[in-house]
Amino acid sequence: MANEVAKLSFWGVRGSTPTVDRATWRYGGNTPCLELITPDGKRLILDCGTGLRILGNRLAASPEKTIDAEILVTHYHWDHIQGIPFFAPLYSAQNKFHFYSFRSDFIGRDSLKRVFEAQMAHPYFPVDLQAMPAQRDFTDVSGGDRFAIGKTRVTTGWLNHPQGCLGYRIETPVGTIVYATDNEPGNLEYERNLRRLAEGADIFINDAQYTPEQLERHRGWGHSSWREGVRIAIAAGVRNLVLFHHDPDSSDKAIDGILRDARAEFENTWAAAEGMVMTLGEDQTDVVIPAVRDGLRREAHFRARVSGLRQDGRPFDQETVIRDLSLHGALIYLDHSPKLQSELQVTIENPGNGDHADRALRGYVVRIEPGPEKDQVGVGIVFTE
C-alpha cells in the first residue's frame, strides 16, 4: 500500500491587496488561499483571497462530478474573502461547501454569511449571493474550539489582529499543519495561543509581512515579521517554517532577502509562492516550487562555475555547462542537489575572444529534476541580479 500523504497547495500568498507588477511575479500577487488534501481525501480550503479564483477554475475544469470542501476562514478583512464572488464552483448546484469562522462582535449572528452577502450586495457587485446555487453551510467557531473533518482534527486559537482573527492547527494522520496568518507580536495572551497552536508542527505557516524594521513602524496594523516567526518556530519545535502574507510592496528580491535572513537563524524556512506544493508524509516533507519560464530559452553551451549549499547545508563549488539559457534564467546540471529557494553564485565564462570579463550572476533555485546522466540533477534557476 502506498504511503499516505497530505498535499498542501498555495494558491495565494500575498497580503493586504493583490499585486500584478513584474517585480512580484515569481512569488505571486494573489491574496491568501491554500488547499489541503488530507490522507482520507478530504479537501480543506484555507481563506478565500483572490487565489481562490485560480483554485476554483482548476476545480471547475477537473473531472470531479461533485466538489465538496470544508473552508476555514481566518477573518473578514478584504484580502481573505475577496475571491468568493469569483469562485466558479459556487455557481454549480451539485457542489457542497461548509464554511467555518468566528462570530464577530461587530456583525453578530451568521457573521460569515452576512459578510459574503454584503460584499456582493448592490451596488458593489453585478449579482448577489442568490446567483450561487451550490449548497452552503456555515458553522461558528471560537478560539480554543476543536472539531473533526474526517480523520483530521482542527483546533482554533485567537490571534492578535484588528477585529479578530483565528489561527488553525490541522492535525492529519501523517502530520500537523498550522496556519497562523495575520498576527501582531507583543501581547502575551496571544503569544501563548500561537505557541500552543504551533507546538511540534510539521509545517508552520506564519505572517511575515514586514521586516523587523518595518514592523516597528506599523504597530497596530496586526502583522508580524520573519524574526517573530523564527522565534516561535524554535520555541515550539517546528519542523518547517513558511513565511506568508507577503507585503504588496515587497518585490521578489526583497522576499529573497527576507528568506536569507530567516534561514540564517532557522534553516528549514520557506517563502510561500503561488503554485508551491508541500507534501507531508509520515517520514518527511517534500517541497515543490513551480517552474518559472518567462522568456524564450535557447539551447546553449556556456562553461560556468556554480557555488552554493547542498540540501544538507554543506557548501559546494563545481564547474559545469549551462545548456538552456534565457535573459531571466537557466537550466544547469550539477553533481549535488541544492536546496529549493536557495541562492547560487553562477560565473559564466565569456565565450568571446577574451576582451570581456566573465559574468558573475546570482541565481535563485526554482526547481530540481533528474539530470541526463546518472548522479546528476537538473537545476532550474532564475537570475536575481
Give the ranges of each region predicted by the language model.
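Binuclear metal-dependent hydrolase catalytic cores
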Residues: 1-178, 188-189, 194, 255-282
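Acidic active-site catalytic centers that drive phospho-/nucleotidyl reactions
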Residues: 47, 79, 182, 207, ...
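Short glycine-rich, flexible loops that bind phosphorylated cofactors or substrates
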Residues: 53, 80, 212-213, 250, ...
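Histidine-centered active-site/metal-ligand motif
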Residues: 75-80, 161, 206, 223, ...
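Flexible, active-site-proximal loop/turn residues at the rims of small-molecule/cofactor binding pockets
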Residues: 77, 87, 210, 247, ...
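Cap/insert and terminal regions of metallo-dependent hydrolase folds
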Residues: 176, 184-274
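Structured alpha-helical
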Residues: 269, 285-385
